[in-house]
């Protein structure tokens, strides 16, 4: 079994995505960067996924904000589909450790590059659609990925990451700020995997994992927000 096959069959990856592929080769293609192959890579899937994502988010905003004008809806959509937002989705899905990159791209830190992570999210969207041929299913999956962000976006807001939102949540309630601590690092650079512990007053310690300390902290903050906002 190759390293890439292991990743594709990893139930944790499929669980995070929220979809079981009938054609796993589509997921492999969605994770394959152009540096590996000029012909067999995610770029065509990214093209498809970009259009599908724009439609899904536009449809959501149209129905969720019936009184907003076209200009504000356009700005909200742009906020939700821009590279930074997709990078956050990729962090939540822990895609950085699953990317299929050339040795050179990997050594240069490509698995942390926001543009590559964002492209991969769009490619996975395209792959799910081709595998399922079910637009409603795809919509449900994508909106589930976006739940932490859709619950907070307003027509005049910019998308905020989980750490920023958690800090604002606690400050608004005059509570101590969260404390983050790295409790485990596995592997050697650039293949390290971090586990971070986050402590918030009144809650049990919550852990987050990721391919960098920043990603792990964001994952932990996202989990705490889910508990606080229940």
Curated annotation (Swiss-Prot):
Q: Which PROSITE patterns match?
A: DS_RBD, RNASE_3_1, RNASE_3_2
Q: Mind listing the GO molecular function terms for this protein?
A: metal ion binding; ribonuclease III activity; rRNA binding
Q: Which organism is it from?
A: Acinetobacter baumannii (strain SDF)
Keywords from UniProt, A to Z, are: Cytoplasm, Endonuclease, Hydrolase, Magnesium, Metal-binding, mRNA processing, Nuclease, RNA-binding, rRNA processing, rRNA-binding, tRNA processing
Identify the EC number(s): 3.1.26.3
Active site (catalytic residues): 50, 122
Write out the residues that bind Mg(2+).
Answer: 46, 119, 122
Taxonomically, the superkingdom here is Bacteria
What is this protein's function per UniProt? Answer: Digests double-stranded RNA. Involved in the processing of primary rRNA transcript to yield the immediate precursors to the large and small rRNAs (23S and 16S). Processes some mRNAs, and tRNAs when they are encoded in the rRNA operon. Processes pre-crRNA and tracrRNA of type II CRISPR loci if present in the organism.
What residue stretches are annotated with the RNase III domain? 10-133
Put simply, this protein is called Ribonuclease 3
Pfam families named in the record: dsrm (PF00035), Ribonucleas_3_3 (PF14622)
Q: What class of enzyme is it?
A: hydrolase
Compartments, as annotated in UniProt: Cytoplasm
Q: Does the keyword Zinc apply?
A: no
Show where the DRBM domain sits.
161-230
State the oligomer form and interacting partners: Homodimer.
One biological process term in Gene Ontology: mRNA processing
Check the record and name the InterPro entries matching this protein: dsRBD_dom (IPR014720), RNase_III (IPR011907), RNase_III_dom (IPR000999), RNase_III_sf (IPR036389)
Cellular-component GO terms for this entry = cytoplasm
User: Reaction catalysed by this chain?
Assistant: Endonucleolytic cleavage to 5'-phosphomonoester
Q: Which family does it belong to?
A: Belongs to the ribonuclease III family.
What's the cofactor?
Mg(2+)
Q: Name the SUPFAM superfamilies for this protein.
A: dsRNA-binding domain-like, RNase III domain-like
């Amino acid at each position: 079994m190759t390293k890439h096959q292991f990743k594709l069959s990893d139930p944790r990856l499929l669980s995070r995505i929220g979809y079981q592929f009938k054609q796993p080769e589509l997921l492999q293609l969605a994770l394959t960067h152009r540096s590996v192959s000029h012909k067999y890579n995610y770029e065509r899937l990214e093209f498809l996924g970009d259009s599908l994502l724009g439609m899904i988010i536009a449809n959501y905003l149209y129905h969720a904000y019936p009184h907003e004008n076209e200009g504000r809806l356009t700005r909200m959509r742009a906020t939700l589909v821009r590279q930074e937002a997709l990078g956050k989705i990729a962090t939540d899905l822990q895609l950085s450790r699953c990317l299929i990159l050339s040795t050179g791209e990997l050594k240069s830190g490509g698995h942390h590059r926001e543009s590559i992570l964002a492209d991969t999210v769009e490619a996975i969207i395209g792959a799910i659609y081709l595998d399922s041929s079910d637009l409603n299913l795809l919509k449900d999956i994508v909106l589930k990925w976006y739940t932490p962000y859709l619950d907070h976006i307003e027509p005049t807001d910019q998308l905020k990451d989980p750490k920023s939102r958690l800090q604002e949540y606690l400050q608004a309630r005059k509570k101590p700020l969260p404390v983050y601590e790295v409790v485990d690092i596995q592997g050697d650079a650039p293949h390290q995997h971090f586990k971070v512990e986050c402590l918030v007053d009144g809650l049990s310690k919550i852990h987050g994992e990721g391919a960098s300390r920043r990603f792990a902290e964001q994952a932990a903050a996202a989990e705490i927000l889910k508990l606080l906002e229940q």
